[in-house]
Regions:
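Ribonuclease/tRNase effector modules and their secretory precursors
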Residues: 1-78
Length: 78
C-alpha cells in the first residue's frame, strides 16, 4: 500500500498508518472509491485511515488522523 502525502497532514507516521491498516477492526465504505478503516497505531491509539481503491492493485492511504467521534458508532457494530 502506498501512503499519499495528504495522509501525513495530521502528523500520523507511516508506521502508524500501516499498522492501523494491517490491524484494522472496522471498514466503513464511504463511497465506491474510498474506504475508512478504523485501527490502532503502534501505541494503541485508535486511528481513522482513508484508503482509495482498497480492493484494487494499487491502494493508496490518503487520510489518517486520530479517530473522530463521528466514527465511534462503527466500533459497536458487529
Amino acid at each position: 500500500m502506498r501512503i499519499g502525502e495528504p495522509a501525513r497532514k495530521h502528523g500520523v507516521s507511516d508506521a502508524d498508518i500501516l499498522h492501523a491498516v494491517r490491524n484494522s477492526m472496522r471498514w466503513v465504505e464511504v463511497d465506491d472509491d474510498l474506504t475508512m478503516l478504523i485501527g490502532a497505531a503502534t501505541d494503541g491509539a485508535l486511528l481513522e485511515v482513508g484508503v482509495l481503491d482498497i480492493h484494487g492493485d494499487d491502494p493508496v492511504a490518503i487520510h489518517a488522523m486520530p479517530l473522530r467521534r463521528k466514527f465511534y458508532r462503527f466500533l459497536s457494530e458487529g
